[in-house]
């Protein structure tokens, strides 16, 4: 099937709602969060992502009007969505593919387009983080040329508002023993 990848304008409210729902659904389907998780509202809030970063979507059909099957966020320097990037690095966040559309290479196509877009916008490097348990994502990023960067690893705990609190090493060790920590591993790619 033909597909189209394009940027989503912040004024495309219905598309942004669709993207938010798809993002939350993908994270739920993978068991990364449950319905009560404080991150769900942030996953659903594609409107904020589109206003403070570049949101890409893939839709079925050449006309760009079909259903959204995947999305990724390209985060520029200075955005409030930056978690890892420094200087003129860009960051990729919230790659999500419809659970019923997996196996079509959608994640790879979206990631490549996001990498290309970051370079078009002046990125010296592209960084991202992913949960330690997301082995399929690790393989995807490594196939696409991302290098594992232990210096970008970080450990967080969830806040009630859907944000995360970055922990010091000592705090992380304690939280990991208590089972409340989430360890994220970092990757980077240079054009």
Region locations from a protein language model:
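Acetyl-CoA-dependent GNAT
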Residues: 3, 7-99, 111-113, 117, ...
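Active-site acidic-Proline motif in GNAT/NAT acetyltransferases
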Residues: 98-100, 104, 132-133
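Residues forming the Rossmann-fold NAD(P)(H) cofactor-binding site
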Residues: 104, 108, 112
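Short glycine-rich hinge loops at helix-strand junctions in the catalytic core
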Residues: 105, 122, 145
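Conserved GNAT acetyl-CoA-binding A-motif
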Residues: 118-129
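Conserved catalytic-core motifs of GNAT/GCN5-like acyltransferases
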Residues: 127-130, 142-185
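Helix-turn-helix
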Residues: 137
């Amino acid at each position: 099937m033909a597909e189209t990848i394009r940027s989503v304008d912040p004024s495309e409210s219905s598309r942004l709602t669709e993207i938010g729902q798809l993002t939350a659904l993908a994270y739920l389907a993978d068991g990364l969060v449950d319905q009560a998780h404080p991150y769900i509202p942030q996953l659903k809030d594609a409107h904020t992502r589109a206003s403070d970063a570049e949101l890409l979507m893939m839709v079925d059909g050449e006309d760009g009007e079909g259903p959204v099957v995947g999305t990724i966020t390209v985060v520029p320097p200075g955005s409030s969505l930056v978690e890892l990037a420094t200087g003129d690095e860009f960051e990729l966040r919230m790659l999500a593919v419809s659970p019923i559309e997996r196996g079509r290479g959608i994640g790879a196509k979206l990631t490549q387009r996001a990498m290309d877009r970051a370079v078009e916008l002046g990125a010296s490097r592209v960084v991202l983080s992913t949960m330690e348990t997301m082995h399929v994502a690790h393989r995807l990023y490594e196939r696409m040329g991302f290098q594992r960067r232990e210096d970008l690893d970080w450990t967080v705990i969830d806040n009630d508002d859907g944000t995360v609190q970055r922990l010091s090493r000592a705090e992380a060790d304690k939280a990991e023993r208590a089972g409340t920590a989430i360890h994220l591993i970092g990757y980077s790619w240079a054009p």
